């Protein structure tokens, strides 16, 4: 779990996301509160519940990007999932408890990586020993092994092929048992594939011929797993999920039951009802054991173009107490997105063209023109936020991108006149939807 202060979290998000100070502050405080709760002792620690967040803002303003960047910062089990993937219990499809099962799998993966790092030195030594066995045989003299060990460490044998036996991962080789109509869902607390694997005594790996360089990574992973206690790892992962898990529930506005509509919307309202106990706190059965959701942080987000936040069930609104409104992006914001962020669109485009030997030189007025065209098109067609910049920029460099292979060594200046020549005629057209999607 991250120990960053709220100010440090916001400054990290600022490197990649323009504006939206309120949303950044809200998620930074929520993330820091996870750490603060860990410092409490006694029964008070169990009483402190997470303050779940509802982010409201137009499409393309940064809601999902905040989630993506937060996942890297959190250092905790983090799951981003769309609310539209789920159906009411009783309907064909995935039920919302799958969220917790998926989060547990993420937690186990994170914990396994940490455990592997802790035993990496021992695992590397064991992997080296297995490669030496494959090269010179287990009965070779110590002097021979040491001679080959030196060559191995000097990377002199990397291209040599060896035959090694790798155990299949998980229940590989056995058929997967899924509930019909529920792709990816396991049968509650029982995983039939795992049970059959154990009953059959596991699967022996087939010998494979690969180079020494390719053999290292899978051998180290296999030897690491031998040194890790799976039961202890699972218990630790579940504890980490229960205490520090974060779920980002995107597109929550799409499960609102709209006024005057019926039919399929019944299932939408059912999904909201199913979410209530999950967000409030319940125990979910998974194949790894029961998981409590009392202290899992839920961050929901939606554009709410067609529906309103008040269309959510009142009980669900009450379980998302912190409301954050994200602002539509301005021309200045668009200019910042094009140039100021760490992996800005202009930097990406210039780097891609440099691979062909073509240097793109964007002037200040070109960047201003790109931003203004994007804002105009958003205003006259459909506001898709910052995603519009990608469409406009691709239109501008379309010809250069197509002929770049033949123009190696050239420097291509792109100014406002060049941008207008490529896209301004479209911006002036009232019906742009035929040209820009």
UniProtKB/Swiss-Prot annotation:
Pfam families: AAA, AAA_2. It comes from Methylorubrum extorquens (strain PA1) (Methylobacterium extorquens). Belongs to the ClpX chaperone family. HslU subfamily. One of its GO terms (biological process) is protein unfolding. Keywords: ATP-binding, Chaperone, Cytoplasm, Nucleotide-binding, Stress response. A double ring-shaped homohexamer of HslV is capped on each side by a ring-shaped HslU homohexamer. The assembly of the HslU/HslV complex is dependent on binding of ATP. The keyword Metal-binding does not apply. It is found in: Cytoplasm. GO terms for molecular function: ATP binding; ATP hydrolysis activity; peptidase activity; proteasome-activating activity. The gene is hslU. ATPase subunit of a proteasome-like degradation complex; this subunit has chaperone activity. The binding of ATP and its subsequent hydrolysis by HslU are essential for unfolding of protein substrates subsequently hydrolyzed by HslV. HslU recognizes the N-terminal part of its protein substrates and unfolds these before they are guided to HslV for hydrolysis. Its main location: cytoplasm. ATP binds at residues 18, 60-65, 250, 315, 387. Signal peptide: none annotated. This is ATP-dependent protease ATPase subunit HslU. The lineage of its organism: Bacteria, Pseudomonadati, Pseudomonadota, Alphaproteobacteria, Hyphomicrobiales. NCBIfam families: hslU, PRK05201.1. One of its GO terms (cellular component) is HslUV protease complex. SUPFAM superfamilies: P-loop containing nucleoside triphosphate hydrolases. PANTHER family: ATP-DEPENDENT CLP PROTEASE ATP-BINDING SUBUNIT CLPX-LIKE, MITOCHONDRIAL-RELATED (PTHR48102), ATP-DEPENDENT PROTEASE ATPASE SUBUNIT HSLU (PTHR48102:SF3). InterPro entries: AAA+_ATPase (IPR003593), ATP-dep_Clp_protease_ClpX (IPR050052), ATPase_AAA_core (IPR003959), Clp_ATPase_C (IPR019489), HslU (IPR004491), P-loop_NTPase (IPR027417).
